[in-house]
Design a protein with these regions (language model features):
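Ligand/cofactor pocket segment of small-molecule handling proteins
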Residues: 94-137
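Short, flexible/disordered intra-domain loops and linkers
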Residues: 6-15
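Amide-donor transfer/coupling interface in amidating biosynthetic enzymes
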Residues: 24, 75, 81, 120-228
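Flexible gly/pro-rich beta->alpha loop and the following alpha-helix that scaffold active-site loops
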Residues: 27-87
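Short catalytic helix/loop segments, enriched in acidic residues and glycine
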Residues: 14-27
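Catalytic nucleophile loop
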Residues: 79-103
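Short glycine-rich anion-binding loops that position phosphate/pyrophosphate groups of nucleotides
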Residues: 4-6, 57-60, 92
């Protein structure tokens, strides 16, 4: 479920977010079949799938003026009611929270950019091999501030306390970006160099000294779907 509506020249230099997710998962399960559905254009799946991944987006889940936002939140509620397997990434994490009764707000400390940790307080069965802390790319200035009723926080950090949620056995979300390569983040920071303050950019660049746990997180994602 591609929700990224960025049409800037910068974004066009890279595969879209849906393609990034496909590349991540197809390396691990080459026999799986994938479709990228541009829900940001108001297009929703015309058929049922075994599982869904919702991408990140520069859009805000609180922006009711976007014509595709309300239908997307309704679609999330439908998937939840049908107990369809769903993974939400960044915006997807926030959209799941918003759709199911949680709250999302702008972070008073500003942007989370670069690499960011999730300290896992709960290890689900499909999170194997287990790891106490994972690091992934971050690009957000909003975050989940209240989870939906029944959701469980699996992990987080001081900057982002609700970094990952699980709802029943069929929904898993993360505030972060397992599909985002380091080269994309480096280019994104360059693109934002005249749009953000120097301290935020310096922290983001410095954080890239930490490697991202992309292979491990991708493995957890496919194992989540297989466990559903």
């Amino acid at each position: 479920l591609r929700t990224n509506d960025d049409t800037s020249a910068f974004a066009k230099d890279f595969p879209n977010d849906g393609q990034k997710v496909v590349e991540l998962l197809q390396r691990l399960r080459p026999h799986w079949q994938f479709d990228v559905v541009p829900v940001k254009d108001g297009v929703f799946p015309a058929q049922a799938y075994d599982g869904y991944v919702m991408t990140g987006s520069p859009a805000s889940v609180n922006d009711a003026s976007l014509p595709w936002m309300a239908p997307l939140l309704d679609f999330i509620r439908q998937l939840d009611a049908e107990q369809k397997p769903l993974i939400g990434l960044c915006f997807g994490h926030q959209a799941v929270a918003k759709a199911l009764g949680g709250e999302v707000a702008r972070h008073s400390a500003g942007w989370g950019l670069g690499t960011a940790p999730t300290h896992w307080t709960t290890t689900a069965d499909w999170m194997q091999p287990s790891q106490a802390t994972t690091t992934l790319m971050a690009a957000h200035n909003e975050q989940v501030t209240r989870m939906p009723e029944g959701a469980v926080c699996l992990g987080g950090s001081d900057f982002c306390p609700i970094g990952s949620m699980q709802i029943s056995q069929h929904i898993w979300t993360t505030q972060f970006h397992p599909e985002m390569p380091r080269v994309f983040m480096q280019a994104l920071l360059g693109y934002l160099s005249d749009k953000l303050d120097a301290d935020t950019l310096a922290r983001a660049h410095a954080s890239l000294a930490n490697s991202a746990d992309v292979p491990l997180f991708g493995q957890w994602m496919v194992q989540f779907f297989e466990a559903c």
